[in-house]
Amino acid sequence: MDQTMTQASDKEASVADKLQYMPGFGNDFETETLPGALPQGQNSPQKCNYGLYAEQLSGSPFTAPRGTNERSWLYRIRPSVRHTRRFSNASYPHWKSAPCLDDHSLPLGQLRWGPMPVPDEKLSFLDGVRTMTTAGDVLTQTGMAAHVYVFNEDMVDDYAFNADGELLIVPQVGAIRVFTEMGIMDVEPLEIVLIPRGMMFKVLRKGDEKVWRGYICENYGAKFTLPDRGPIGANCLANPRDFKTPVAAYEDKEAPCRVHVKWCGKFYVTEIGHSPLDVVAWHGNYAPFKYDLRTFSPVGAILFDHPDPSIFTVLTAPTESAGTANVDFVIFPPRWLVAEHTFRPPWYHRNIMSEFMGLIHGQYDAKEEGFVPGGISLHNMMLPHGPDASGFEKASNSELKPVKLDHTMAFMFETRYPQQVTKYAAELETLQDNYLECWDGLERRFDGTPGIK
């Protein structure tokens, strides 16, 4: 399969309108843009076809167990040692890393923000990242950071890789084209894309929006994988065949370019004379992918009670403690509500985990007002949360007939570590000072006498 990034610098590069992908999660893929570019029967021949260089990209230690051992072999125009020169310091002041204990006056509490404002200035994807929370420690490769992004300009001659973690990108407004070393992916709202740790990429705009906006989970820990299904069995939730990895593509461009690097929480930049996206063929299991959230097959209660939200886990990044995630990516998709004699929305809750929520589309069933597409809520560990007063009244008194919860897609980045709010988030103009008032109408009903009140 052949997709070649050309030297075109506009946002619609001259590649096939319909990009090609390989289905599967964690597969050992192989793909080449030119016939015979991929060596057969070995990884590192004395001389590669087409004058290419062989290079391995490792996503795990060499001695990791086979089931978690990840690496890919890349056959490229230049080796990666030519894609960096002497580094100089770079500044992205709004992109923070854990631990980030910013000095601000915002006290502890349940928090909610409206959508990110539209920028007045020109911003690329890298320029437009704004960190809302951090958790854990980037130096020990534990925890995560939750970001929002808003941009209106392409990365043309700018490229980046993140040595601190993998990037899970969740578009909310505007489709994006993600060029990586290993291929091209077009990603629209209601899809996600994952860029592995250390992989070179750039992000371009698709379509004619005024602004491109979304969310990012920067996972410092073990990489995202599919959760175990347990008694659910072999099917449902996120099925492996619905994950799409791009076929090989390369950009043969000789022009001044900049490579931006995030390493141990700091940023650096280096200048080179060519595109680093020059992989002509590759094989392996360390690769980017995209996933359409609309293909998630939810399970739920079909008689009574509301199940735990863990049944909506798309991806999980585990820790050494079984069942305790460094970070989970959870969605709340369209689904049927059929439980009898049951309060159907999510129940009131205090949790050891810390929950960062966003809304891609529609309305969230536990919050009918205030939580809007592009917005954010943060419920840190052991802080109570649950349906607002109007949602409680509606769910407590509605007829319990089958109802389809439709035209909605909320998500959650949930971590075992407390999420520290950044100074930027604490002072953001869209912070809703009246959020706690959504529970003010939940009055005492108990009077000591038996009966349903």
From Swiss-Prot:
Record-level Gene Ontology MF annotations: homogentisate 1,2-dioxygenase activity; iron ion binding
CDD domains assigned to the protein according to its UniProt record, in alphabetical order: cupin_HGO_N
PANTHER family the UniProt entry points to: HOMOGENTISATE 1,2-DIOXYGENASE
EC class of the enzyme, as a word: oxidoreductase
Family in the record: Belongs to the homogentisate dioxygenase family.
Species lineage: Bacteria, Pseudomonadati, Pseudomonadota, Alphaproteobacteria, Hyphomicrobiales
Designated gene of the protein: hmgA
GO terms (BP aspect): L-phenylalanine catabolic process; tyrosine catabolic process
Record's subunit section: Hexamer; dimer of trimers.
Residues that, per the record, bind Fe cation: 349, 355, 385
EC numbers, comma separated: 1.13.11.5
Cofactor dependency: Fe cation
Family annotation (InterPro entries): HgmA_C, HgmA_N, Homogentis_dOase, Homogentis_dOase_bac, RmlC-like_jellyroll, RmlC_Cupin_sf
Sites where the protein binds homogentisate: 364, 385
NCBIfam families linked: hmgA
Cellular component terms per the entry's GO annotation: cytoplasm
Full protein name: Homogentisate 1,2-dioxygenase
Pfam families assigned: HgmA_C, HgmA_N
Catalytic activity line of the entry: homogentisate + O2 = 4-maleylacetoacetate + H(+)
Function summary: Involved in the catabolism of homogentisate (2,5-dihydroxyphenylacetate or 2,5-OH-PhAc), a central intermediate in the degradation of phenylalanine and tyrosine. Catalyzes the oxidative ring cleavage of the aromatic ring of homogentisate to yield maleylacetoacetate.
Active-site residue list: 306
Record's keyword terms, sorted: Dioxygenase, Iron, Metal-binding, Oxidoreductase, Phenylalanine catabolism, Tyrosine catabolism
Pathway the protein acts in: Amino-acid degradation; L-phenylalanine degradation; acetoacetate and fumarate from L-phenylalanine: step 4/6
